[in-house]
Structure formats: C-alpha cells, structure tokens
C-alpha cells in the first residue's frame, strides 16, 4: 500500500 501511495504523492509534488 506504500508503493502506490508514494507514486501518487511523487506525481502530485511535481505538479505543485
């Protein structure tokens, strides 16, 4: 569950 969450957060962080 940590894998998908981290991926989503990474994308959101890049988007700003």
From Swiss-Prot:
The keyword Zinc applies. Its EC number is 4.1.2.13. Its cofactor is Zn(2+). GO terms for biological process: glycolytic process. One of its GO terms (molecular function) is fructose-bisphosphate aldolase activity. Pathway: Carbohydrate degradation; glycolysis; D-glyceraldehyde 3-phosphate and glycerone phosphate from D-glucose: step 4/4. It is an enzyme of class 4 (lyase). Homodimer. This is Fructose-bisphosphate aldolase.
């Amino acid at each position: 569950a940590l894998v998908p969450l981290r991926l989503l957060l990474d994308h959101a962080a890049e988007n700003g």
